[in-house]
């Protein structure tokens, strides 16, 4: 049975909202930069809320994504879902770290759907880092 929404909430509370567990500082900076770079490609004409995300796999590969809005709300896609989709498309199935880049000075927490996606591809100890401008 796949992990549930509450499973991820427990995990996020346990490791803290901001963490650098098991990552060297420069590696976290590189992953954060990928998330902010992806954010620049956001298609968000309705909310103007540009989000980027980047995932790191156990093999060291990185994948990024941005949010893509649609006039047919709620058919848009979150940055986390795009990054995870890119990862899966390339044959990877595990996340060892994920960074979510906010477009302003507040943290952008994953929505319920993205929390579920993260939980399905990430072990309990996976850090979820939120970055702000």
Locate predicted features.
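Short beta-strand scaffold segments in enzyme catalytic cores
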Residues: 48-57
């Amino acid at each position: 049975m796949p992990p549930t929404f509450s499973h991820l909430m427990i995990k996020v509370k346990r490791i803290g909202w901001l963490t650098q567990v098991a990552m060297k500082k420069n590696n976290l900076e590189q992953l954060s930069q990928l998330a902010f770079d992806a954010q620049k490609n956001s298609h968000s004409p309705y909310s103007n809320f540009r989000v980027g995300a980047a995932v790191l796999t156990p093999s060291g590969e990185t994948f990024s994504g941005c949010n893509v809005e649609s006039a047919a709300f709620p058919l848009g896609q979150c940055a986390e879902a795009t990054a995870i989709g890119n990862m899966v498309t390339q044959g990877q199935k595990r996340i060892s770290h994920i960074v979510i880049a906010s477009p302003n000075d507040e943290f952008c927490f994953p929505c319920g759907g993205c929390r579920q996606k993260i939980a399905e591809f990430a072990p309990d100890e996976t850090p979820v880092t939120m970055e702000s401008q």
